[in-house]
């Protein structure tokens, strides 16, 4: 009887743990990024001659849609990048540019990511766009139902990837206004494959006042 009780207790604990892992209770809470915090982020160009710039240069006059890529080789990130790129014609009409930032430049990862992303890509070595409160998802991600649903969705859509580079620090998407408009949209990835709403991105981009 004692062994049965122990066995049932272990099963019950496992089930309770699985249920808990699929709630948001164990997830690190994000801290909103202020426009001043993001504006002072140090970025580097990747194409051609490397140069450094402050992030505010990306949106000061035209606003911007910026994807903070969790990992360029991740097939879920490639899926979201492709979907954001589908908005490029509409963003161009609005005069709002599309950019991405990555944490690191590993091998050919950025080059291989380019077919999925229609905007310019910058290096954010200090990972400012992943803060100010960095959020990580490790093994917990692989027992979350939502993550597996995201895996299946992207796989069925034909996306492929690899395991190169750091992929546990979660990313997000920002829509930045011009001048003093501030952050118009901040989407923080809560789990692997948690995509931003394209409708929300476009709605926020339409609020940008582009300087002529």
Swiss-Prot record:
**Protein source organism:** Danio rerio (Zebrafish)
- Pfam families, alphabetized: AhpC-TSA_2
Q: What is the lineage of its organism?
A: Eukaryota, Metazoa, Chordata, Craniata, Vertebrata
Concerning SUPFAM superfamilies, the annotation shows: Thioredoxin-like (SSF52833)
Tissues where this protein is expressed: Expressed in kidney marrow.
- Enumerate the PANTHER family for this protein: PEROXIREDOXIN-LIKE 2A (PTHR28630:SF31), PTHR28630
Q: Which family does it belong to?
A: Belongs to the peroxiredoxin-like PRXL2 family. PRXL2A subfamily.
| Ranges for region Thioredoxin fold | 3-101
Something else the entry says is: The active site Cys-77 corresponds to one of the redox-active cysteines of peroxiredoxins.
Q: Which gene encodes it?
A: prxl2a
Q: What is this protein called?
A: Peroxiredoxin-like 2A
């Amino acid at each position: 009887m004692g062994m049965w009780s122990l066995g049932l207790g272990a099963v019950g604990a496992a089930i309770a743990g699985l249920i808990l892992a699929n709630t948001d209770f164990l997830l690190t809470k994000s801290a909103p990024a202020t426009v001043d915090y993001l504006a002072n982020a140090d970025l580097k160009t990747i194409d051609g001659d490397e140069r450094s710039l402050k992030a505010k240069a990306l949106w000061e006059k035209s606003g911007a849609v910026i994807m903070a890529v969790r990992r360029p080789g991740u097939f879920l990130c490639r899926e979201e990048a492709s979907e954001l790129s589908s908005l490029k014609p509409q963003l161009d009409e609005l005069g709002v540019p599309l950019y991405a930032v990555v944490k690191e430049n590993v091998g050919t990862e950025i080059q291989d990511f380019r077919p999925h992303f229609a905007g310019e890509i910058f290096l954010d070595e200090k990972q400012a766009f992943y803060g100010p409160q960095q959020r990580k998802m490790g093994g917990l991600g692989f027992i979350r139902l939502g993550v597996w649903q995201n895996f299946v969705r992207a796989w069925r859509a034909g996306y492929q990837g690899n395991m190169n580079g750091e992929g546990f620090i979660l990313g997000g998407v920002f829509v930045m206004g011009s001048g003093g408009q501030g952050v118009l949209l901040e989407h923080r990835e809560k789990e692997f494959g948690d995509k931003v709403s394209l409708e929300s991105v476009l709605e926020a981009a339409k609020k940008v006042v582009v300087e002529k």
